[in-house]
From Swiss-Prot:
Quaternary structure and interacting proteins, as annotated: Component of the Mediator complex.
Spans annotated as Disordered: 126-162
Protein family according to the UniProt entry: Belongs to the Mediator complex subunit 31 family.
The keyword Transcription appears for this protein: yes
Underlying gene: soh1
Function comment: Component of the Mediator complex, a coactivator involved in the regulated transcription of nearly all RNA polymerase II-dependent genes. Mediator functions as a bridge to convey information from gene-specific regulatory proteins to the basal RNA polymerase II transcription machinery. Mediator is recruited to promoters by direct interactions with regulatory proteins and serves as a scaffold for the assembly of a functional preinitiation complex with RNA polymerase II and the general transcription factors.
Lineage of producing organism: Eukaryota, Fungi, Dikarya, Ascomycota, Pezizomycotina
Organism: Neosartorya fischeri (strain ATCC 1020 / DSM 3700 / CBS 544.65 / FGSC A1164 / JCM 1740 / NRRL 181 / WB 181) (Aspergillus fischerianus)
Domain of life: Eukaryota
Protein name as catalogued: Mediator of RNA polymerase II transcription subunit 31
Gene Ontology CC terms, in alphabetical order: mediator complex
Length: 162
């Protein structure tokens, strides 16, 4: 499989639907708006999200972080760094939900917690996909503010539903 998006992560692909790298990354980040896709990633590729296959009792601190998890976290940070700009966000079908998911995925604790069904259901219940789940979190904290201000509010909303 072509590893081009990881080969030069500092170079943004030109925002054109004719650019294969751009369309590949657009498809990937768009899929992150779906909490059930996040669940699929957590279950199928737990190592990429820093989820240990063994229980936390083996966490003695002697092992360093998984290099694959670090690379994937860096890739997510790279994606978030440019998809949040208006030049790229205009191509997103669900920009609020997509950018919210990318922002939450910047946090190690969130990447570990998304394997729990309660967290996924809470995300689905907040309207991550369509904004109909009660409080529309993404409208207030991503629509106009590209910072990380809404992260604590997102955590509290998710925690209150679990």
């Amino acid at each position: 499989m072509d590893q081009q998006p990881l080969a030069h992560p500092q170079q943004r692909p030109p925002p054109s639907l004719k650019n294969p790298r751009f369309t590949l990354e657009l498809e990937f980040v768009s899929s992150l708006a779906n909490p059930y896709y996040l669940s699929h990633l957590a279950v199928t590729y737990p190592n990429l999200l820093g989820i240990s296959k063994s229980s936390d009792d083996s966490n003695t601190g002697t092992e360093g972080p998984d290099p694959e998890a670090q690379a994937f976290a860096a890739y997510l940070a790279y994606l978030y760094s440019y998809w949040k700009t208006p030049e790229y966000a205009q191509f997103l079908t669900h920009p609020g939900a997509t950018l919210r998911a990318l922002r939450l995925l910047q946090e190690e604790t969130f990447r570990r917690d998304i394997i729990r069904p309660q967290v996924i259901e809470a995300l689905a219940g907040t309207g991550l996909e369509d904004g109909q789940g009660g409080q529309n979190v993404e409208a207030g904290d991503i629509g106009h503010n590209e910072g990380d201000q809404g992260t604590q509010q997102d955590k509290e909303n998710i925690a209150s539903k679990t």
